[in-house]
Structures are given as C-alpha cells and as structure tokens.
C-alpha cells in the first residue's frame, strides 16, 4: 500500500505524506503551500469562490481539464491529477495569463473576492476550447456567484476570449505538464492501493473491484465517497468525524459507461458530466436536466451512483431514471443483484441495501425516449434544489397512451411514481382532458409536506400543473419550457 498523495500543483510535483483523510484540497492549499488566491466562500460547493482546475490524462495522454470546488474535495482525491490554481496562471516574469488579462481589460472585478473562481472557470473553458460563446457562457459560469452582481463585465471578458484570432493554440499547450504528471505516476508503486490515515479519519482508495468489495464487507460502517459533493458537506458544514472513508475513484472498472444492444450501464465512479455527454444524442431531454441539475464544478465531481445512493427525496436524477425504467445494481463481495430503481427507495433515509452492499452501477435503456419530459421547478434556474420535479414518459400506440411512468421528486419522502395518475392515463387518448383527469388523481398518490421550498398546497398545485403541461407537450406537438434568456442574450439587447 502507498501512503503518499501524488499530484501536480501548478506544474510542480507534490508528494503529501502526512494529512488527515478528511482534509479538503482548499484547506491544504491555503495552509501548506500558502496559496491563498483560492477563496473559501460558502464551504458547500455553491458559490464557486474556491474553483480550481483539475486535469487528468485522457487515453492519448493529453490533459482534460475540469473546474472543481476545492472546498469540498478531499485532498486524497487529487492523487494522480494535475491541479492549477489562480496563483499559478501568470508567467514567471509576471505577464498575466490571457484569461486574467481579459478580466482586467473588461473591468470585471469589483470587490474581488469571487474573481479567482471566475478566472479559473474561464481558464478551464479556454483550455478546453469550449464554453466561451454566447450560447454556452451561462453554463460555464453557473457555478460562480458574484455578490456585487458584476456579471456583465465578466461575460464581456469571456466573449472576448472566444474570438478565434485572440490566442493561438500554442498558447494553450500543456504538453510539459502532461509529461510531468506521467513521470510522477510512473513510479512502481503508484498503482498500489492508497491509504491516508493521519488523524481521526482515514481514507482508503483501492484499485480493484475485489479490494473495494472486500473492504466494505469487512467495514460496512465506512463512508463511501465518490465525488464528495454531498459527503464533503458533512465535514465542512456539519463538522462530522467520518472515521473511515472508502473512495471509488481509483478503480478503473468503476469509471465505465458500457452500451450493449438495449441497455446502458453506468459505473459507480462515472461523473454527471460524463453521463450527460454519453446520453446527449439519444436523450437530449435528460441531458438538459443534467445541465440544470448542477453547475460544471459539481457535474465534474459528483457521480450518478452517488446521487442514487444518497437517496434524496428530490434528487432530480432518480425521477428521470425511474421514468425510463432503470435498474440499480448492488454488490456485496461476489453477490450481485439488480432491482427496479423505484424499489430501491423504501422510506426517508432507508434503501433496500444490506450491510456491506454498495451501489455498483445503474442500468438504463439505451434507446431514445421521444416522449420523455423532465420538469424541474426551483427558485433559481441553475444549480438549485427542486421544490417539485416531474419526469414523465409514456408509449403511444395509435394515439392511445400505454405504459405511462410518472415519477415525482419533492412530493414524498422518496422519489416516487404516481400510481393513481398513471392508471388514469392507461388506454386513454392523447388529449388535454386525459391529463386533466390524471392531474386530479395525483391527490390519491401524494400528501406532500410544507418546508422552506414550498407549502404542501403549492407542491400539489404545481405537480398537477406540470402533468397538464406534459399533456400540452404531447397533444399540441410542441414543447413548453421555463427557460431564461441568458446573460449573453440579454446583453445583445442592451
């Protein structure tokens, strides 16, 4: 076993041998190398002030960069990666990086606290040659908040960076960094299991499925960590001592998206962003939900199976996967079983999962679902928890509804299908009266609660309206969307 965390920081090799398993990347950056350009804002992966760039090599050895929230990512999770912070962008002679220069030219900083995070999100887009246009800049910056509301100047800087003649591809070369990372990872023991056990919390990162399953069967109270977008908050906001953590991220077989004739398998380490890319062509409706589900920082770290395993009453993704007829795979040692995803959720905080058993994958249909619609109602358009979520899917044969699947989030203690409303749709024509009658039946399916995101009456009325909206989508042959114009589009009119 290996006990040192190895990564690149602004191009320089790092080996960290003495660290607590639950030390965050942000905590280490600010206290050890004293790189304090990266800021702590919310401490929960929401504001983006802590954004840094994380690069991992693709199959060709080139680095692919992602923005991540350093405030909730545990330091051992950057093992084998390249990290770049705002402190490392300028050249040794002090010349600003093109992203920094564009921000200065656009007067895009006010109080300046959020500026490093915005710079790093734009840096990732600049490195990847994607996400700086008018049609994509909103998504690029959705995970960064500016309390001074200086967004217009920041967007202007981004659009300036998108000009094709501003910077040559040579400016973006990170071949030397990729080579340095490859050399760091070439040590004979690099592929050994990683153990970080300083302090009260230890962090174990096995490299094979068998080692992972064996450890969890022997230590069923371990906290499984995938992207830390949920577990990270247990440390930063709830101040919990986690004891033993078990990470999925160093098992290559866990990071798989496998397509066969009629099903798609999603492994336990597959991120939201990779999943969205894999299903975009066949399931554009679901891909659009993924864009609203979370900003790029969270999509780049959080995983599909982690979202299922934490069993949120809303979750956004579980209703959509239930509407598609997906199944969850559970593993304990050599025993593997599958069950329908809606049967996995039993009650609030309770799933059909035995001690030592973990979510080892999701199976979902691989073919397009032309009648799938996903409706997310939240106070913010991007990166917000839903008040009500509806994922609806039906088959239509000769104008008649068959096999309806209506799955709601935010209406019960678990993501749940609406059995009475589904029964009201079966065998009925695709017309508005059908869906109006089904909407009335929702009162037999749910007794929602009131909380800070909405009253019980609001949730019921919204759920009924969403089902009628689905009927409009199908019967009128057009889509009705609650979509914002976007910052770049608004700027065109100013």
State where each predicted segment sits:
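Short structural boundary motif marking the start of a folded domain
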Residues: 1-7
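C-terminal structural segment of proteins
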Residues: 8, 13, 53-57, 63-69, ...
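Short, contiguous acidic and Ser/Thr-rich linear segments
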Residues: 12-21
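A basic, amphipathic helix-loop patch mediating RNA/tRNA/ribosome contacts
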Residues: 20-52
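Short, surface-exposed linear segments at secondary-structure transitions and domain or protein termini
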Residues: 23-28, 74-82, 346-354, 382-384
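Short Cys/His-rich Zn2+-coordinating modules
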Residues: 30-35, 95-96, 128-131
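Helix-adjacent hinge/juxtasegments
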Residues: 52-89
